[in-house]
Amino acid sequence: NKQHVGTFGDLGTFSFFPGKNLGAYGDAGGIITNNKKYAEKCLRLRNHGSINKYDHTMIGKNSRLDTIQSAILDIKLKDYKKEVLKKRNQLAQIYLEKLKNIKGLYLFQKKSYAVNSYHQFVVRTLKRDQLKKYLDDKKIQTMIHYPYMLSDLKIFKNQKGHKNLTNAKELGNKILSLPISQDHTKKEILYIVKNIKNFFSVNKK
């Protein structure tokens, strides 16, 4: 609804990890806010608690984004909407059109009121592991990006409030990320579609 991601709260955070749609060449990230108080605090926290040299008013750390990474992101950002976002949406549309009528394969439909960045293109199927192996054998790399829920991690496992996450667990065992990036071609996506269709044609039960 024409409101940018990251602007729904007091602060928004973005990862610029190299594998992201808008990625630097090393670890990087950013925070946005229109609150001057929070902005100043973030500036201090990222620089050992100081904005002006030797004026340390709180405990902070070195979280400054170096100039090289900033320059890389600045160049990439200029082409992000025109090149990256547009290309990923075009390729995602091929998936959505070509895979929509396959029995046993479920797609996450895009919403009319939102623009999707398609950092990942995720499908859902009971035959997730078999499909992944089939595509791997065809030299098509797929990913299970998040094989564990947060509640399964040791740090959270014994905390209260997440004993019966049956829907999340069920979904987590069915989802698979298909290849998608601005560097993929239409021909490559159609090849992936062809192999997915082949898999389901011989694995109907």
Where are these regions (language model features)?
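Short beta-strand-to-turn element immediately C-terminal to the catalytic PLP-Schiff-base lysine
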Residues: 14-15, 29-34
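Conserved active-site segment immediately N-terminal to the catalytic lysine
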Residues: 1-23, 52-57
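A residue-level structural signature of the nucleotidyltransferase/glycosyltransferase Rossmann-like core
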Residues: 21-22, 30, 65
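PLP-dependent aminotransferase class I/II
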Residues: 34-205
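Adenylate-forming
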Residues: 12, 24-28, 71-73
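Solvent-exposed polar/charged
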Residues: 6-7, 24, 31, 170
